[in-house]
Amino acid sequence: MRCIGISNRDFVEGVSGGSWVDIVLEHGSCVTTMAKNKPTLDFEVIKTEAKQPATLRKSCFEAKLTNTTTESRCPTLGEPSLNEEQDKRLVCKHSMVDRGWGNGCGLFGKGGIVTCAMFTCKKNMEGKFVHPENLEYTIVITPHSGEEHAVGNDTGKHGKELKITPQSSITEAELTGYGTVTMQCSPRTGLDFNEIVLLQMEDKAWLVHRQWFLDLPLPWLPGADTQGSNWIQKETLVTFKNPHAKKQDVVVLGSQEGAMQTALTGAAEIQMSSGNLLFTGHLKCRLRMDKLQLKGISYSMCTGKFKIVKEFAETQHGTIVIRVQYEGDGSPCKIPFEIIDLEKRHVLGCLITVYPIVTEKDSPVNIEADPPFGDSYIIIGIEPGQLKLHWLKKGSSIGQMFETTMRGAKRMAILGDTAWDFGSLGGVFTSIGKALNQVFGTIYGAAFSGVSWTMKILIGVIITCIGMNSRSTSLSVSLVLVGVVTLYLGGMVHA
């Protein structure tokens, strides 16, 4: 029950356990899958790491100068030189200065002067390449076991952790007591790593444009440089003052860390953990659940009394969680659970924790269920010790329909075409079709539920014809669009 504590939660239900199921996992969200005769599973991406990114360039933002040396010549005596000029670790500058009788020269005029100083970088930052094949995704899969300590648990101890990389995109997770689930995932970071550089400065990192980083007016070293001393463009952090006869002062600029922090305002900051860089993004995965099995399906039904350990309440997803305790004998056993209408004639709602079981007497069990909108009764156990609980779920199916549609529209606005992967239940939708299904699929399903596909096609044709014959331009365009969407969704649903 890991997903209970996460606000952004998707449900994938009604899928055959023997088929591939398409889901999309993103940071900050959780996906719950439910299939017939299969355990309910929660999937969450908890971490995306960039392993061993290659260094493109190092840039120095704080330096110091030592061992300053100056050599000068009188007019007409040639250009001065220093042996230190051959050392690439030094920064040097040639200048001209006024000379004459007052400073040791027999002639008046311009004499040469050269000054060198040892340049040492104290602090630097690195720009790193990140290749998609270096990304590692950590996924936690947690079955709905009903155990008390597993509700909303974020430690990873009660789920199975999987490491997904482009090199090992197909992996299997062994869930103790439930069998094996197979995952085939492909990363969708939404980033163009050819144009992006990871700028790492001390214990912080940012995503910046590659060309912006290369244009920084700071001393730099190639990423392949192993000596770390032969800085290029050292003069960008050094100022040579005006020379006076045989003397010239050279100073180094102060730390540029503050200027860099200001320049990076608004850039996407990347978190770091144990030297690895943590990314966002999402994974498109296909699940195969044919090797999964329900735990305790052969157990008999519990015949004793149950009691409510903690008052049940509605979660932020519209579901409810009930904590009960079995006081009877015969454990382990299955917990009888159903949701019925007020007349007690029809079974309603959906049990998310499939086949909840009691492993031992007096041990609390958590059950998650999705009751229908309005009034209903929750029945736990069998007579004579049966629990009958009244529940009122606020809202309506129409409101939920529009809420789901708005969620799909927001995803498309934020993520672009990558959002078309969300909400896929194994159907084949491509290009614009995925967008139409994502945004309008819920409304369409509610409006035309129970209508045959031929009638849907006919309605779409009629609406399109009316729009084409309308004299009002705005009405014509609106009706044609509605008709085309109706035709498309009608054809896709039938297919």
Swiss-Prot record:
SUPFAM superfamilies in alphabetical order: E set domains (SSF81296), Viral glycoprotein, central and dimerisation domains (SSF56983)
Listed transmembrane segments: 446-466, 473-493
GO cellular component: host cell endoplasmic reticulum membrane; membrane; viral envelope; viral nucleocapsid; virion membrane
Keywords carried by this UniProt record: Clathrin-mediated endocytosis of virus by host, Cleavage on pair of basic residues, Disulfide bond, Fusion of virus membrane with host endosomal membrane, Fusion of virus membrane with host membrane, Glycoprotein, Host endoplasmic reticulum, Host membrane, Host-virus interaction, Inhibition of host innate immune response by virus, Membrane, Suppressor of RNA silencing, Transmembrane, Transmembrane helix, Viral attachment to host cell, Viral envelope protein, Viral immunoevasion, Viral nucleoprotein, Viral penetration into host cytoplasm, Virion, Virus endocytosis by host, Virus entry into host cell, Zinc
Topological domain spans for side Extracellular: 1-445, 494-495
GO biological process, one term: virion attachment to host cell
Glycan attachment sites: 67, 153
Entry-linked Pfam families: Flavi_E_stem (PF21659), Flavi_glycop_C (PF02832), Flavi_glycoprot (PF00869)
Region ranges (Fusion peptide): 98-111
Cystine connections: 3-30, 60-121, 74-105, 92-116, 185-285, 302-333
An MF annotation (GO) of this entry: protein dimerization activity
Keyword Membrane found: yes
Cytoplasmic side of membrane: 467-472
Additional remarks: Isolate M3 comes from a patient with dengue fever.
Matching NCBIfam families: flavi_E_stem
Name of the protein in question: Genome polyprotein
